């Protein structure tokens, strides 16, 4: 797989590192990792840099992951870029809401590198 740039949006710096490690363990060749601590920071990052994959938490201060997703989709900041939501939210309504907002994948915390691989790799192949 070719090198990719990933934007990881989560209000926990520890979780951002865990997600990065899981992506690497899943076999992704990450050339660059852009980190954002809120949806607002993620939105700003995409105004200046292009990502090949976006991984975002849902529950964050300032701008949650769903609003972040809606805004990047409506502004055309991530056309054709797969977005995967990683969150502790377990209800099916959260999955439906994320998919309706424009996410292509949804992973519940806690997760394994295998779960990340199984949900992310097909999205990158089809992107």
Predicted region positions:
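Two-component/phosphorelay signaling modules centered on CheY-like receiver
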Residues: 13-34, 123
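Helix N-cap/capping motif at the beta->alpha junctions
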Residues: 35-44, 65
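Short amphipathic alpha-helix used as the core "switch/output" element in two-component signaling
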Residues: 44, 66-79
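Active-site beta3 strand of CheY-like receiver
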Residues: 49-55
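Active-site residues of response regulator receiver
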Residues: 57, 87
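Receiver (REC) domain active-site loop signature in two-component systems and cognate sites
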Residues: 60
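C-terminal output helix
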Residues: 111-120
